[in-house]
């Protein structure tokens, strides 16, 4: 029985059963080692004290409380931190991304990220901008504790159905919902990088994994949608982070695509191109029954100085 499920919402009876089974299976010494390795990672967004889970509610010592939703996530994006009623991705873009990614088109990237996490042998991971959870759910299998946070509640609701061993949180990068110095690796895949907050939550010499579009990413798609194609500038992240992080490794992952019409529509809908492109150009492109593209991803692994 997986201990991390307890962090996701076991009741008292479930915990007793888990303890009994674990004692029988691994012995009392190993059991206490496992329990010691697990820790509460979440931080109260109001007073910044540790949150503990009891009876499907996260509480801090100052009695601020946050209920776990029926879908399995907790909302730590407090009202005073919101700038709009429904921040983040739209429901349409979330559903389009879920359909596109679940079809496996970006599987080479998912595999590359998982392999890197496995090689680092880390214990705690925070995925910033987890979205609908495609990458987060896969990374979780390589660590002891995994937290996925996104500002879009509709995305986290979808993510929470994928993997019950992830602690799914609605939250903001401006105040990451985890405690100081408790994370081995922060990941940011196609998401903003709140550098100071990442520095706060990372352990000494912790890692930051950044994934961003490489120069050639979806070039044919952008060429069809826009009169002028502006190149992606992945190197800007190296320049941005060089003061507080050492660049450990950088590499590119290519994913050649042959998209049927439905997948093409999903791809457009899940990107900013959906609202940046002129409607007539988007409609013309979506008439294609098939489209050949190359997805190209730039990956950076940084280490906190």
Predicted segments, located by residue:
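A short acidic, Gly/Pro-enriched loop at the edge of an enzyme's catalytic core
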Residues: 174-185
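A short glycine-rich, Lys/Arg-flanked "PGG" loop and its adjoining helix->strand segment in the class I
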Residues: 195-209
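Conserved SAM-binding strand-loop segment of SAM-dependent methyltransferases
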Residues: 164-176
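Conserved SAM-binding loop of SAM-dependent methyltransferases across substrates and taxa
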Residues: 132-143
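Conserved Class I S-adenosyl-L-methionine
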Residues: 253-305
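Conserved class I S-adenosyl-L-methionine
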Residues: 121-131
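Conserved SAM/SAH-binding beta-strand->alpha-helix loop
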Residues: 152-154
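N-terminal auxiliary segments of SAM/dcSAM-dependent transferases
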Residues: 35-86
